[in-house]
Amino acid sequence: MAAMEESFPRGGTRKTHKSEKAFQQSVEQDNLFDISTEEESTKRKKIQKGPAKTKKLKVETRQSSKFVREKFEILNVESLCEGMRILGCVKEVNELELAISLPNGLQGYVQVTEICDAYTEKLNEQVAQEEPLQDLVGLPELFSPGMLVRCVVSSLDTTKGSKKNVMLSLNPKNVNRVLSAETLKPGMLLTGTVSSLEDHGYLVDIGVSGARAFLPLQKAQEYIRQKNKGAKLKVGQYLNCLIEEVKGSRGVVTLSIGHSEVSAAIATEEQSWTLNSLLPGLVVKAQVQKVTPLGLTLKFLSFFSGLVDFMHLDPKKAGTYFSNQQVRACVLCVHPRTRAVRLSLRPVFLQPGRPLTRLLCQQLGAVLDDVPVQGFFGSAGATFKLKDGTLAYARRNHLSNSKKTFKPEAFKPGNTHKCRIIDYSQMDELALLSLRTSIIEAQFLWYHDIKPGALVKGKVLTIKPHGMVVKMGKQIRGLVPTMHLADILIKNPEKKYHVGDEVKCRVLLCDPKAKKLMMTLKKTLVESKLPAITCYDDAKPGLQTHGFILRVKDYGCIVKFYNDVQGLVPRHELSAEYVPDPESVFYTGQVVKVVVLNCEPSKERMLLSFRLLSDPKQEGEGQSQKKKKAVSAGQLADVKVLEKTKDGLKVAVLPHNIPGFLPTAHLSDHVTNGPLLYHWLQTGDTLHRVLCLSVSEERVLLCRKPALVSAVEGGQNPKSFSEIHPGMLLIGFVKNIKDYGVFVQFPSGLSGLAPKAILSDKFVTSTSDHFVEGQTVVAKVTNVDEEKQRMLLSLRLSDCTLGDLATTSLLLLSQCLEERQGVRSLMSNRDSVLIQTLAEMTPGMALDLEVQEVLEDGSVLFSEGPVPGLVLRASKYHRAGQELEPGQKKKAVILNVDMLKLEVHVSLCHDLVNRKAKKLKKGSDLQAIVQHLEESFAVASLVETGHLAAFSLTSHLNDTFRFDSEKLQVGQGVSLTLQTTEPGVTGLLLAIEGPAAKRTMRQTRKDSETVDEDEEVDPALVVGTVKKHTLSIGDVVTGTVKSIKPTHVVVTLEDGIIGCIHASHILDDVPVGTSPTAKLKVGKKVTARVIGGRDMKTFKFLPISHPRFIRTIPELSVRPSELKEDGHTTLNTHSVSPLEKIKQYQPGQTVTCFLKKYNMVKKWLEVEIAPDIRGRIPLLLTSLSFKVLKHPDKKFQIGQALKATVVGPAESSKAFLCLSLIGPHKLKKGEVAMGRVVKVTPKEGLTVSFPFGRVGRVSMFHVSDSYSETHLEDFVPQQVVRCYVLSAATPVLTLSLRSSRTNPETKSKITDPEINSIEDLEEGQLLRGFVKSVQPSGVLVGLGPSVTGLARHPHVSQHNQSKNAPYDRHLPEGKLLTAKVLRLNHQESLVELSLLPDATGKQDVLSAPLGQPPPKQEGRETEAVERNHEGKAKEKKKQKQKEKRTGKGQEGAQPPSKDKKEPQKPQAKKLGKRPHPESSSEQEIGNKKQKKAALSEEDDSGVEVYYREGEEAEEMSMLPKEKLTRPAEAPRLQLSSGFVWDVGLDTLTPALPPHGDSSDSEEDEKPEQATQKKKSKKERELEKQKAEKELSRIEEALMDPGRQPESAEDFDRLVLSSPSSSLLWLQYMAFHLQATEIEKARAVAERALKTISFREEQEKLNVWVALLNLENMYGSQESLTKVFERAVQYNEPLKVFLHLADIYTKSEKFQEAGELYNRMLKRFRQEKAVWVKYGAFLLRRGKAEASHRVMQRALECLPKKEHVDVIAKFAQLEFQLGDAERARAIFESTLSIYPKRTDVWSVYIDMIIKHGSQKEARAIFERVIHLSLAPKRMKFFFKRYLDYEKQHGSEKDVQAVKAKALEYVEAKSSMMDD
């Protein structure tokens, strides 16, 4: 029975007596919520009466379930009633009405007079004036599709077809009629319309009597900027308004329409909503009461109940709802009679003010096959799933043709049906379907399905004087005007047509928006086979069609076609004979046949003729010959395309339609453009200015080549051989190609031969390689034979140059691109959206794409283009070396559009995607990189800016052949001269290529870590390699050791040949940890065997068989085993290539390798196994010790021999082996390995990655041997952890971080043992676990990764035994609990637990009985406390979670009062009543928190600080507010880590004061207001004195000079008192930046620059640097450049350059930083600081070689006196950032030249102490104290030596240094005595 009672929603409709009705009505007015209580008690009494009422009870139960089903029925028109308030969405906007989408697929309409009273008044005023008003705008400007609106059903009109039209009203007076001025509260969300514009804001009509609403301008600015596009609000504009303040006495309401405030608005109990006043669109917090298949019942605002039907569940959470679940819901409608409230859980409704996404109507009317059923809901209907994944819905009456044929079993989930989309419901985000056969087979469903010119069938509905109405479907009506009932006018149409007759019509006009359809029944038009003209673009000259005369005038006839297209037949075209009076011959409505003479679509003008042209196919032969005489060779004419053939186009020569043929090759001068034009030309297209080449009996041969047309027009067309003489240059085309030469024909028909010998300046192997048939060429006549009518021609470029090659090149390029643009125009006329989109795409356009597939050749295919089906491709080169995966989002730039293959070539290159805005100059010479190649032109990108430019690959019509060596390649560098500075319609700049000598080699995209880049060449190897040698493999040679390096030894052989011995070829058995090269000494004679050689240029190790071995550096071996070897068995292994050799190494194999260096950037050790085999040891594979991983350079020495295990080829390059020093080559169960944290998932665990390419997961049960709720907070991404592999059975490893696993030898204490299965548990065992969830059956506690226990309700807490106890508030997921195992069920794997104190020995999990009110507090009524206890419990839980997260929480801290709203700005602080003082212990806790907050702030900056301050402010609100507002204790403005000017503005972190709301919550205010009326006179006097004291205290605070600035006015006062203090100005800027007010921060900076005195140069520079920082972070590159240029003008340029370089570096804009440093090196080449900073920059980026080159350049540019300092600086940098060995070499070289530079010695000593060993440090001290220096300097070094030994040495070492100093003093004294 309890369940039955819950099923009754609020507001039932059971029958009641009149007295009972009256009683309920009075109760509702007093306390609406007592009804449910009385009903429950009544029902309980009935139950208690005993078995006598059992039968009646069953009936009641059945009725109640039926009642629930009725309530869950979806809305229909019958369930609506007048006055019902409902939420809707604007679907369509027309001039006079709005179409509103309502829930459950309903639709209503709002008339233009139902917007608001002010708008209606404006309309009436406009009608009265008969002139449009300026301040009155139409509905399309006030409303847009997708807007959510609150409506009221104003009327339900019934049409003739018994269909109801739902008429709605948006007028606030109707919508908000249920509210009164007294019920308005701050925080309420209302809707209103703008009624007028005032000086300081807007008056808003909210429709509440007795209340006036005002919207201040500042509260509307955000909305105006974001939603209104900067325009002011208009009268009638619909707004979602939040009440900010209510002034009760005058009824004035202050509103806000800010997006953040409105979207966060939520209805609360404090706002005193009732069922009568509840408005649609309100967002409420609700609790799920019951879950049914049809939907949910919710409880909200404590007392109200509501329904959520299946359409309005959250699609992502459907099926997961459970009882007592807390959700947020939106009110959809409230029925005024039944009081039923319907709600929605869809996320889109939970943010008020957010518009709904507009559904695409492309498929509207589409018939779909095999659509599967997703769910069947009985009488409500069924849902279906479409192919694209979207949901669709069909009502019950649309599931079958009739009720009799309906079969419910046919709609089981998964069954498929044929259906048709009939509409879209935006409110439900669903497509509406119908399965009715009549609808599926209907020709048209909606007006937009009907196209002008289409044939349609319909039934006569009515016959009226103005025409006949025809019905063509359920929704479609059309009109046949009286004029169109027949070919001639009929007087009595009712005699010919009858109601119900089926008629066949042709559509004249269809306007879907206006639902206007006009048709014709004229037989000639209906049965016409001629093409119909439906738009002006269809009207091609020569087209014949039917139309009807609209008007007859003196000047001719106006003929109308379809879709309001009309044209004029001039008087002289009415007939072949003169027509004196057109009105006597023609009449209106007459059907006529016309031919199009001319049409201008842009002007909508068309010229027609009744004098029909003859069809050439039907002409007689004699007439045809007669017309052909009208065309002669050399004549220009327009042609119309008739048909396409294999080789060209069949055309008709206009105006006489003479048949002709236009070959494909003759469409263009450019060979590639001919097929392109042929492909896109269509039948009916007209080509202008076509040249007639020849006229024969069969056909007329035509040509469209612009070069030939220009030659004919220019008179360069000799018609006979007598007009031709040697030396003439003629333009023709290749007619035929033979082995011996090429025949060229000219426009007049003459032809000549170009022999092979003079065909080209280049050697001609095959004539067909140089020319193709139909190609346009320029020929020079070399010989003429008039008798034989022959001539010889030359096609060589040197003979046929027409002028400047550069000009010709540009002309050819322009012509080629212009023709391609013409092709785009042809494409844009096609119906296909794909082709139209391709036509609009031009090079240089940026696209946001998604990677679809990476092909085997390295190229990439993309999806997510502008239209589906578009092929977008990036070549391997244009991947720019990026690692891509399917689904990855990328930004790309279009390079070229292939209009034949319908492909778009794009590039991901960084320089192209991030194009720079720089002004270009015409004629400037620029470097460019070739990005794309076509046959006739190339597309290149300018190096400086990234702009795309096109340049011709040919400089002449004959210039078509290139040898392979001359051909350009993608990536090759070229020099271009710009001819245009702005890209035209083609999207490309035009340019001319410079000399070919300026071309550079192709820029290959290669891996940043290749063998070539890593190869470091020993300078000793470069010397002496010029000589050839006669050595061969196996020869034994002798030599002298020249130098010793860590991994190799350089040896000088006979005849000065240099050889090399690798560390692996010195000893047979190398002890681990030793350096083999140390065995050899400089000058020692060695005997070695030649085993290979290194190339002189590349220094790569070459195999034996290499042909250039005689010019290599011999590779030697001194290993005893190889020296004793007589044969070549050992040596033959060196003949294998390195890559093949690497493949021979097997994973798990142990090798000896030699450390070359530690790569700090890539975090690996680089080692050499052999001269040609190198490897990498990732840092995580070097050791299991965290100490070693932290400082690997201290553990491993360069040149040291290491034993390593082969893992496999390196991931980044197959030229390297991946090695490991910790043993295993693959991860398996039981292994311990080092990994790196990739992700930390709260309440779940960690994800860890390994160098082996594997990934593993660590459960929260395996993080530590002792559980903690916060132990996951100790981990951050990229942190190194030691892991134990528990399982490797799946691709994702199972790991453990427990010390008992990773360090078993430590024998650490195990507080919480591992629980992997139920077998690990025993009954009575005490253990700890984490709360997983709270279920109706009890609390689920996780005991291990796969073991979960259940604590049933009686075993959870001793305070409450109810099953419905809200434990989830007190036992959140992840909470750590101690439990006792009560029972184990091994068969069902069930574990029963107890959490009770007597079982666990711990405190009760619930500190107090649930539902018990907290202790009564001062100044509060008990009622308010009880009512708000639940809300406070939530706030307390949130606060505890925040304290846990930030690490600042303390036990016993007072939770804050329930906040009404989070303030948006830190400065927004209201003064109000002061709270009661708190206890001293709470104050101490607050002080601790404040100190912690201040400490944590020092290590952070920027935006993060801003948000942290927001959190701290919330926490500080827990402190006594008296303390917070005391000015003496207000926190001061703080700067993190000192004041450094070259850091970002975000490090300036003003410690803004906490912005807690000083007034109490609304719950506290109500009782105080109630008691305020009852105060005595004495109390009022005391209150007045108290208020005066508070006011004086505030005034004192404002006068305090040390007061913390809280607003812009405060900062203005400060900068007024100290105008030249940059610190204050920067704090002012930071204040604005933290509020994201970028423009205001800029304005402050500009004020500072104007205000600060010109004498304060440093202060001004500080502001300039801050402004640069601001523009770098928030501005564009252009704005940053402008500020930088200004800063350089007003400050010392070098300082500004250096600051900007640092800004770029710190913001990781390394490319910009590099470019800036290059500019600085050119401008400040005499400044050593620039060179040193650039060197440091490169070293930090890992570019050591580049840094070395910079040092060499610095020494060339700087004066000699600076050299030593620069060298020392670079050496210092090498020690710190680069190779320590190289740094030592630089210092040693410098000190050998300048041995008395004590400053260099001092720096060298510092570096050795810091980066070297103690042995090295003592060695250098020994050297320096034996130098011959001045005694004063020697004293300095002795003192340093002594200090060093005191710190690092023993007492013996200290005494030794003292003895040496004494010895030095005695020696000096004896010398002075002598």
From Swiss-Prot:
Residues 83-171, 187-258, 281-346, 365-436, 453-522, 542-611, 634-705, 727-796, 844-909, 1034-1107, 1148-1222, 1230-1298, 1324-1396 form the S1 motif domain. It is found in: Nucleus, Nucleolus. The modification Phosphoserine is found at residues 7, 438, 1362, 1479, 1496, 1501. SMART domains: HAT, S1. GO terms for molecular function: RNA binding. Residues 1417-1433, 1578-1589 have a biased composition (Basic and acidic residues). HAT repeats lie at residues 1602-1634, 1708-1740, 1778-1810, 1812-1847. The keyword Signal does not apply. Keywords: Acetylation, Isopeptide bond, Nucleus, Phosphoprotein, Repeat, rRNA processing, Ubl conjugation. GO terms for cellular component: nucleolus; small-subunit processome. There is a cross-link at residue 1416 (Glycyl lysine isopeptide (Lys-Gly) (interchain with G-Cter in SUMO2)). The keyword Membrane does not apply. One of its GO terms (biological process) is rRNA processing. There is a cross-link at residue 1028 (Glycyl lysine isopeptide (Lys-Gly) (interchain with G-Cter in SUMO1)). It comes from the Eukaryota. The modification N-acetylalanine is found at residue 2. Residues 1-55, 1351-1370, 1404-1530, 1547-1589 are annotated as: Disordered. InterPro entries: HAT (IPR003107), NA-bd_OB-fold (IPR012340), Rrp5 (IPR045209), Rrp5_S1_rpt_hs11_sc8 (IPR048058), Rrp5_S1_rpt_hs1_sc1 (IPR048059), S1_domain (IPR003029), Suf (IPR008847), TPR-like_helical_dom_sf (IPR011990). Residues 43-55, 1434-1447 have a biased composition (Basic residues). Interacts with NF-kappa-B p50/NFKB1 and NF-kappa-B p65/RELA. Essential for the generation of mature 18S rRNA, specifically necessary for cleavages at sites A0, 1 and 2 of the 47S precursor. Directly interacts with U3 snoRNA. This is Protein RRP5 homolog. The gene is PDCD11.
